């Protein structure tokens, strides 16, 4: 019986899982919509919902807890200055998961995880080294 086992292991060590969810949380906060596999999206949702709740609290201790979780100061700034006030009146349920078919190659189920009431312009903004190189050239 598997009673009481929460979450999935994803065939990774604990540290690798924590790093993976930190990176995915930062990507979701940055772009407000990401595509990943369905099990990863299902396990990412509670992590991000707790981060949004920290952003709604807005005090110094909550900010330090968020920094310890996602390790990206710019994303923590967005979390507390943009997302926290945006969801101040909403009592939870900040993310939505939509199934997105199956991945070519290994047929893994894909999902789109996004924020409810997301900023549609945030998707793909300043993403990747090519964008950074283009901005540096200007």
From Swiss-Prot:
Q: InterPro entries from the xrefs? A: Ribosomal_bL17, Ribosomal_bL17_CS, Ribosomal_bL17_sf
Has keyword Ribonucleoprotein? yes
GO CC annotation: what is one?
Answer: cytosolic large ribosomal subunit
Give a yes or no for keyword rRNA-binding in this entry: no
What keywords is this UniProt entry annotated with?
A: Ribonucleoprotein, Ribosomal protein
One of the protein's GO biological processes: translation
| GO MF annotation: an example | structural constituent of ribosome
Q: How does it assemble?
A: Part of the 50S ribosomal subunit. Contacts protein L32.
In terms of PANTHER family, this protein maps to: LARGE RIBOSOMAL SUBUNIT PROTEIN BL17M, RIBOSOMAL PROTEIN L17
- State the family it belongs to: Belongs to the bacterial ribosomal protein bL17 family.
Q: Which HAMAP family match?
A: Ribosomal_bL17 (MF_01368)
What this protein is called in its record is Large ribosomal subunit protein bL17
- Where is the organism placed in the taxonomic lineage, from the top? Bacteria, Pseudomonadati, Pseudomonadota, Alphaproteobacteria, Hyphomicrobiales
